[in-house]
Structures are given as C-alpha cells and as structure tokens.
C-alpha cells in the first residue's frame, strides 16, 4: 500500500487507557505530567477517563469503558486520524476478557503509525520528545488510493 503524509498539530490528541490494575500508576503519571497534558486534547476509555477527569481535574473526552466497546471506539478514532498518541498502561500479568479488543487497538495504532506507550518510561519518552510540542508529519496508509485501486 502506498503511503501519504498526515500532519499532526502542535497540540496532540492523546488517548489515555489503563487496565484495572494499572489505573493507579496511570493516575500517578498523569498527576506528574498534568501541566503538559493540559496542552493537548485528551481522550480516554470510560472508567479510566472518569477517574482521571475527577482526580486530576483535566478535561477528557470519555468513550465507553474498554470491555463495553471503548477500545473499539478508540480504534475507530485512530483509523479516522483523530488520535495522535496512545498512552496505554496495560497489565502484562493479567488477561482481560476483552483481550481481542486490546490486540485490535494496538494493531490499528501500528497500522496508522501513531506513537504508543505501554508503560511509564515510554510515556515519559513520548512526552519529553520535542515533536509533542510542534507540528509533526507521519506516514500513513493512503486509504483513498487503496480504495480507488480496488474499485476500478
């Protein structure tokens, strides 16, 4: 598939997600990075977003809870080019009933070439990157070209 450029604005659209055992570590990270996160547009799955919004006093667009379809909603936003960065504190030691949704979410993040952090260290690397505060161009699949070639 051919690639095209997609321009990310200086204010990124950041998705925040955490499995149940990782909600407190994500909250602690968000509290530590709160002032920087305020510069961006924040999205989160339902339970995580509600908790972060209340505790960190941040404006967050909340989707459904992950097991109720929130991971899939987030995947759709990624595919539509409406999410720039995914911060996903997942629990590598415990399986969740919606593991297929989680795998699909991570797959879409890879397909659409968005940065993904699955732990605190990587999240810090992403937040400290100069590209988080400036416009940045990424290469993404040319879906319009793909569709045109498949339907001609």
Curated annotation (Swiss-Prot):
InterPro entries: Methylgl_synth, Methylglyoxal_synth_AS, MGS-like_dom, MGS-like_dom_sf. One of its GO terms (cellular component) is cytosol. The active site is at 71 (proton donor/acceptor). GO terms for biological process: methylglyoxal biosynthetic process. Residues 6-152 form the MGS-like domain. CDD domains: MGS (cd01422). Keywords: Lyase. GO terms for molecular function: methylglyoxal synthase activity. It catalyses: dihydroxyacetone phosphate = methylglyoxal + phosphate. Its EC number is 4.2.3.3. Substrate binds at residues 19, 23, 45-48, 65-66, 98. NCBIfam families: MGSA (TIGR00160), PRK05234.1 (NF003559). Catalyzes the formation of methylglyoxal from dihydroxyacetone phosphate. Belongs to the methylglyoxal synthase family. This is Methylglyoxal synthase. It comes from Aeromonas salmonicida (strain A449).
